[in-house]
């Protein structure tokens, strides 16, 4: 499993905080950030890498998280969530089988961002009754 991470200019600093944290937790990180990327381009790059392997997860950071979320939800087979708290990050894995989260550097601080990332990457899909909704989401794109 790889954690694919990316950010636009507004999310660069927080991306490095999250990246360093996850590397210290022994996760394999793939950073697809390129200088001057818009949130649209970085979200597409993260999604492309996430979709290469079933187990891969993605994190995109910009100023507010809304833009990358909108982009991610346009991608076939991508279930994504915009999160700004630990519980939502964990639960979106458990109930929605989300493979990508977005967050805003203007909304969350360093410690919260690390906790959000930790909740997301440690969350496990519960399946069962939740699969009905996941199937519905996947049919939409």
Curated annotation (Swiss-Prot):
What species does this protein belong to? Streptococcus pneumoniae (strain P1031)
Enumerate the Gene Ontology biological process terms.
D-allose catabolic process; galactose catabolic process; lactose catabolic process via tagatose-6-phosphate; pentose-phosphate shunt, non-oxidative branch
UniProt cross-references to NCBIfam families, sorted A to Z: lacA, PRK08621.1, PRK12613.1, rpiB_lacA_lacB
Write down the EC number.
5.3.1.26
**InterPro entries from the xrefs?**
LacA, RpiB_LacA_LacB, RpiB_LacA_LacB_sf
Q: Tell me how this protein assembles.
A: Heteromultimeric protein consisting of LacA and LacB.
> Gene3D superfamilies of this UniProt entry?
Sugar-phosphate isomerase, RpiB/LacA/LacB
Q: Which SUPFAM superfamilies match?
A: Ribose/Galactose isomerase RpiB/AlsB
This entry's Gene Ontology molecular function terms read: galactose-6-phosphate isomerase activity; ribose-5-phosphate isomerase activity
Q: Which family does it belong to?
A: Belongs to the LacAB/RpiB family.
Say which domain of life the source belongs to.
Bacteria
Q: Which reaction does it catalyse?
A: aldehydo-D-galactose 6-phosphate = keto-D-tagatose 6-phosphate
Q: Pathway of this protein?
A: Carbohydrate metabolism; D-galactose 6-phosphate degradation; D-tagatose 6-phosphate from D-galactose 6-phosphate: step 1/1
Could you identify this protein by its name?
Galactose-6-phosphate isomerase subunit LacA
Tell me which stretches of the chain form a coiled coil: none
List the keywords (alphabetical). Isomerase, Lactose metabolism
Under the heading PANTHER family, the entry gives: GALACTOSE-6-PHOSPHATE ISOMERASE SUBUNIT LACA (PTHR30345:SF5), RIBOSE-5-PHOSPHATE ISOMERASE B (PTHR30345)
